[in-house]
Design a protein with these regions (language model features):
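CheY-like receiver
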Residues: 10, 136-197
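A short, hydrophobic beta-strand element within the central beta-sheet of small alpha/beta folds
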Residues: 18, 88-101
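Two-component/phosphorelay signaling modules centered on CheY-like receiver
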Residues: 24-48
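Alpha4 helix (beta4-alpha4-beta5 surface) of REC/receiver domains from two-component response regulators
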Residues: 31-32, 76, 101-116, 142, ...
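Acidic, metal-coordinating helix/loop segments flanking the phosphotransfer/catalytic sites
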Residues: 44-62, 66
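Active-site residues of response regulator receiver
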Residues: 66-68, 98
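Short amphipathic alpha-helix used as the core "switch/output" element in two-component signaling
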Residues: 68, 73-89
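C-terminal output helix
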Residues: 122-131, 135, 139, 143-144
C-alpha cells in the first residue's frame, strides 16, 4: 500500500469523529493523533452506551473504535451501528483498532461491518492512510440477513484509484493464471491472452 503523501493537503477540520476506547491512555493517544490530522470535532466515548448515545444525536463522518474493552468491544458497537436505522450514521466509515491481529480478529472486524482493522500500537501514518483510503473508496454497502456493511469482496477490487498496492499486482497475476478448465481443454481465456501479449 502506498504511504500517505506528506505533501498532500487534506482538510479533515470538519470531520465529526467518534473515538471509542475505555482506556484513558488509549483514548488520549487517539485524540492526539486525530487532532494532529486537523480533526476538531471529537466525541470521546469510553463505553458502547456513550457511543450509541452520540451516534443517536450527531451526524458522524468517522468512527475509530478499540476492538477489545472490559465490558464490550468495538466490534459490537460497529455491528450495532450497521444494523440500527440511524441514517446516515449506519453508513459511517468505521476503523477498528486491535493489539491482536489473528485471522479470527480480522474476520470479526470484517464481519461486524468495519471498513478497516488497524494493528496497535497505532502509527499515525498508517491511520491516516486508512482514513484517506476510506475517503476515496466507493465500495457499495451490503445489507442482508447475516451482514450489513461495506462490500467485503475486497481482493478483486484492487486499491482505490491513485493508490498503489499489492492487490493490483495480485489481480494482474490472477488474470495471467489459466483457469483449471482452460488448462484441460487447451483453450486460453481471452483475458489471459490479452495479459500475455
Amino acid at each position: 500500500m502506498a504511504e500517505a503523501n506528506p505533501k498532500a493537503r487534506v482538510n479533515l477540520e470538519r470531520a465529526v469523529t467518534l473515538l471509542l476506547d475505555d482506556n484513558p491512555e488509549g483514548i488520549s493517544i487517539l485524540v492526539q493523533i486525530v487532532t494532529a490530522f486537523g480533526i476538531k470535532s471529537l466525541h470521546r466515548c469510553t463505553s458502547i452506551e456513550a457511543a450509541q448515545e452520540v451516534a443517536g444525536q450527531y451526524e458522524l463522518d468517522l468512527i475509530v473504535a478499540n476492538a477489545n474493552m472490559r465490558d464490550s468491544s468495538g466490534y459490537d458497537f460497529v455491528s450495532w451501528l450497521r444494523r440500527v436505522n440511524l441514517e446516515p450514521n449506519s453508513f459511517t466509515p468505521a476503523i477498528i483498532l486491535t493489539g491482536h491481529t489473528q485471522v479470527s480478529n480480522v474476520r470479526k472486524a470484517r464481519d461486524c461491518g468495519a471498513n478497516f482493522i488497524v494493528a496497535k500500537p497505532v502509527s499515525p501514518s498508517v491511520l491516516l492512510e486508512r482514513i484517506l483510503w476510506v475517503a476515496r473508496e466507493s465500495r457499495p454497502f451490503v445489507a442482508c440477513d447475516t451482514y450489513v456493511g461495506p462490500d467485503r469482496r475486497y481482493k478483486d477490487m484492487g486499491p482505490p484509484e491513485g493508490m498503489e498496492g499489492r492487490r493490483r499486482e495480485d489481480k494482474l497475476a490472477k488474470a495471467a493464471t489459466p483457469a483449471p478448465a482452460a488448462e484441460e481443454s487447451g483453450e486460453v481465456p481471452e483475458a489471459q491472452a490479452k495479459a500475455v501479449q
